[in-house]
């Protein structure tokens, strides 16, 4: 298990100014380092991703953007906004101060809705998806429901759970899934193995 720190408010993306290349560090440096220095299954079949809140948002985007690298995703209360809507509503002056800068193509490359649409066939084939959020998590539930609908419309199979009266609370989220937390990924790893190895 690897628990990387993505910094504050990076959402696990590369900043437009190059100061915070978080996604590149994770994808191009961290994963190869782990696979080179530890006994791993150095492929999608041996790799899962998950996170809570900003970590859930980042995990979701990375899994949808790089479906060849992960066999499962568990997003817990990760806000899933439509980035292109934010870009289109902003003024040029506002865009210049934002993490992703003022180029629409950069935002499109990091918009989870756009990359899910683009990679839908590979996602359907490769990535097992589980999403959970509390019904009292007002700041995140609406976008998570929106993404759930997006996956449904694209025909991407996934497990979607709303936990009654749960707010944005990592400890309570962990308690809710305590008995099955790792079972989900273990099952995903088993399902991802080639048939001859099962």
Where are these regions (language model features)?
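Non-catalytic cap/lid and distal C-terminal segments of serine-dependent acyl enzymes
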Residues: 1-198
